[in-house]
């Protein structure tokens, strides 16, 4: 198999240096403008694909050229925008057109979980036997030298209080408002740590959060790794997830997990989490309080989480992806 990777201006230098055995082709477009990226996907990408004489085009982020001139596979990670239109904001109109179009134009659709497959079939009308599931592998890399916890706490001014960590975009379907309210019911020495980029929804979250909630903004991978390790537990209260990669990241580091009993999260966490109803603030608080107060439960979940995390690897993702390629090229559907 010959692999050709099409990369924009920002990604090209690192991909060209790192991807041995693959041809990396630079496409003159910036990833900083979503509108320009979509326009390039519809115009520059098909032309580059034809020049490269490839047999199959894999689009990895939900959308695809309307006219590619060759077979396509498209990864649609989720269709959460269908359940929560406010998540996509002003871009929702474009998303509502481009994602279903990509599904129709592709011989195969790849997605991250059985739950996302069900949503793609339901909301986009794609035939179930045309959708392949390729669960993701580990997220951020484990550093060779993790940041010492004392150093991390001092740098981020976290003191010595027990930490409850969540890693989620500040958008409505991530349900952070209920988590903040739930933490307000916990013992006073607990701190909820919320890393991640600011969004238009952050002001509302800050208004309901007290001093026990720390919004850190963007953090690098080494810092995020340190937060997972320093946390007494990790909580993901989402109302919808296409996969739930932070759950896997937490389990890989031996951090006990509490998460919503919805969509893809049980596929990822298996029996290695405390589950709750994400619409019930009291149930969220009870789940977190159980983890904070029960050392034996944390030990069991730590062991179960490490074992559960072993089920996921990028090698498995690659095998499922290649099988989808074969199906597309043989025109099986």
Which ranges hold each PLM region?
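Carbohydrate transferase catalytic cores enriched for Leloir-type hexosyltransferases
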Residues: 1-333
């Amino acid at each position: 198999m010959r692999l050709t990777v099409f990369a924009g201006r920002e990604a090209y230098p690192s991909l060209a240096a790192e991807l041995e055995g693959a041809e990396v082709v630079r496409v003159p477009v910036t990833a900083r403008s979503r509108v320009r990226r979509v326009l390039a996907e519809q115009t520059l990408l098909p032309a580059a694909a034809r020049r490269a004489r490839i047999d199959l085009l894999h689009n990895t982020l939900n959308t695809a050229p309307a006219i590619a001139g060759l077979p396509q596979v498209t990864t649609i990670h989720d269709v959460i925008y269908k359940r929560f239109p406010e998540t996509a904001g002003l871009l929702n109109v474009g998303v509502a057109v481009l994602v279903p179009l990509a599904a129709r134009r592709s011989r195969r659709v790849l997605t991250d979980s059985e739950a996302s497959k069900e949503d793609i079939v339901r909301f986009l009308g794609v035939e179930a036997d045309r959708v392949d599931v390729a669960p993701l592998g580990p997220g951020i890399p484990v550093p060779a030298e993790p940041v010492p916890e004392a150093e991390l706490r001092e740098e981020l001014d976290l003191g010595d209080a027990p930490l409850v960590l969540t890693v989620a975009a500040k958008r409505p379907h991530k349900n952070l408002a209920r988590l903040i309210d739930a933490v307000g019911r916990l013992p006073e020495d607990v701190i909820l740590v919320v890393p991640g980029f600011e969004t238009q929804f952050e002001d509302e979250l800050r208004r309901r959060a007290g001093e026990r909630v720390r919004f850190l903004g963007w953090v690098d991978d080494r810092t995020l790794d340190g937060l997972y390790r320093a946390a007494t537990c990790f909580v993901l209260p989402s109302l919808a997830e296409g996969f739930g990669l932070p759950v896997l990241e937490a389990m890989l580091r031996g951090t006990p997990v509490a998460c919503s009993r919805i969509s893809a999260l049980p596929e990822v966490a298996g029996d290695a989490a405390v589950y709750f109803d994400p619409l019930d603030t009291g149930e969220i608080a009870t789940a977190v309080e159980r983890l904070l107060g029960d050392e034996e439960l944390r030990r069991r979940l730590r062991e179960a989480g490490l074992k559960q995390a072993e089920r996921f690897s990028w090698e498995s993702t690659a095998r499922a992806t290649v099988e989808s390629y074969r199906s597309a090229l043989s025109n099986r559907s």
